Amino acid sequence: MDIISGQALFLLFCFISSCFLISTTARSRRSSGRAATLPPGPPRLPIIGNIHQVGKNPHSSFADLAKIYGPIMSLKFGCLNSVVITSPEAAREVLRTHDQILSGRKSNDSIRCFGHEEVSVIWLPPSSARWRMLRKLSVTLMFSPQRTEATKALRMKKVQELVSFMNESSERKEAVDISRASYTTVLNIISNILFSVDLGSYDSKKSNEFQDTVIGAMEAAGKPDAANYFPFMGFLDLQGNRKAMRGLTERLFRVFRGFMDAKIAEKSLGNYSKDVSNRDFLDSLLILNEGDEAELDNNDIEHLLLDMFTAGTDTSSSTLEWAMAELLRNPKTMVKAQAEMDRVLGQNSVVQESDISGLPYLQAVVKETFRLHPAAPLLVPRKAESDVEVLGFMVPKDTQVLVNVWAIGRDPSVWENPSQFEPERFMGKDIDVKGRDYELTPFGGGRRICPGLPLAVKTVSLMLASLLYSFDWKLPNGVVSEDLDMDETFGITLHRTNTLYAIPVKKQTIN
């Protein structure tokens, strides 16, 4: 069932069920003294509040409303009180000044339906000992500078496999599905870090199945759902999100259990590496699972792998696809990026990660992609752990807080020509995506900043540089750059609605 028809169904149900909410409405009216200090927002309809204004692309709908009601805006979705942040100044307040109070999580029904919020490093509150333990494990075993450096050769190998696939497609003059190809590359990088195996192949359906599963889960987790606004309706599963999410995550859990069982069997035979540096992520987790005082059980491991797998694969491949789409739509920008690489690297070379620091225009292209197409347009929803004042307005306890980084990246008061893809805006400017410049925070900030940020930036930059250095690119079937659509499909991760196909043309001067 699509979003629009699903919304119509639950709006009708809301009307029929309104009698159950009379007491809630009355309590809200009795609290009018505090409401005077709430951020401004659009008028609310009885019972449903502002649900009718969400639309199928909430990040865009909220951006339009913010033009009227300001950079900190109150919305009510059924029983759910929300505040939407739409300026760098307000984002700083949330992500830095009041980070501790606003670092809770507001999980949705599709996350709660399989108990993920109770064991997930993404959804647990930072105040919990379990979150601190899982966060430490994630950083130490996967995202630390030492681990990132240790997997550099792996990234290089997998990106060269991508280039080889593009070479074969170029020889056949075939258009390539950029999303599928980039996902296969990122999938194999992440699966080797986690399990020491390739899970994807460029000439099989396996990668496609994984990508469809992960994208389906991210969309189910992110799209509007009646149960998020009226929790008592969750058991009805009006839009089928619970059923979809349980089915999708169970597929991934089966894969994880297979690897866990295989590694446990190998270890029982003594076939495992005693060299810590050679252990993959799952090896290290299973060691922590041993003994009577184990820090983790199998359920913890499955859910942690789910966090690492979904967040690590989908976001990076989506960003690469958006970057290629923008460059194909702006061919002069592509030529400029390629000219920089030819000048710096010369000919008949292979792009190394160490080369990226000497390619400022390429880095600007990546930043510009993050600005216009942040992987998580509203970040992951935060929750106020207590009442807190933000820019002079009261954000009550338990309010959902959404930081609309998509809208901030397109704010004309912050960016000149905000809708245009212009990497030049970053040249000579010390602006990065590390959570310190609040006009550009695609990975969040504060204690909730994405720990995989360095790995993601390295992976996307190396993939993009390698594709631009080795190939020229053209659109298939006579499509001209001006006609390339940039429609979006909303979820926790923001995807292109329509598949991006492009034909790689091998450069004659590159071996």
From Swiss-Prot:
Q: Which residues bind heme?
A: C450
The record's similarity note reads: Belongs to the cytochrome P450 family.
Q: Which residue windows are transmembrane per the record?
A: 3-23
State the UniProt keywords alphabetically: Heme, Iron, Membrane, Metal-binding, Monooxygenase, Oxidoreductase, Transmembrane, Transmembrane helix
Membrane topology field: Single-pass membrane protein
Q: What is this protein called?
A: Cytochrome P450 76C4
Gene Ontology annotations for the cellular component aspect, listed alphabetically: membrane
Instruction: Supply one GO molecular-function term.
Output: oxidoreductase activity, acting on paired donors, with incorporation or reduction of molecular oxygen
Q: What is its EC number?
A: 1.14.-.-
The species this protein was found in: Arabidopsis thaliana (Mouse-ear cress)
Its needed co-factors are: heme
